Amino acid sequence: MEKNNTTKPRKIGPYFLSKVTITYWLDGCVFLSVPASEISISNIAGSIPSINCWVISTGKPLSLEILADALSKSSSWAPDLKLQEWQIISSYQYKLLFVPQCGQVLSKGST
């Protein structure tokens, strides 16, 4: 059995993404919702660059300072994407909208 070192938990503030559920939206529709421990953020961003809107759900509320710090470092866990905007859905959920770093055009969902 070979050892897989590519899916280490990625840290957001004091919380590890392995304790977080991440939901991805594709073109305005729910596309994928998985525990982050089962997925590599950078691999998903790299292999499916059209995923542009993510909701991070945490087990406990994050302070605005922790969230802002985590989002300012998003290039470390979403290297192919640039954070365009974010909003608080609830004290446990945060919606992140990313755009590709290389200027690709993403399809938008209906508004």
From Swiss-Prot:
Domain of life where this protein originates: Eukaryota
Extra facts: Partially overlaps SNT2.
Protein name per the record: Putative uncharacterized protein YGL132W
Species for this entry: Saccharomyces cerevisiae (strain ATCC 204508 / S288c)
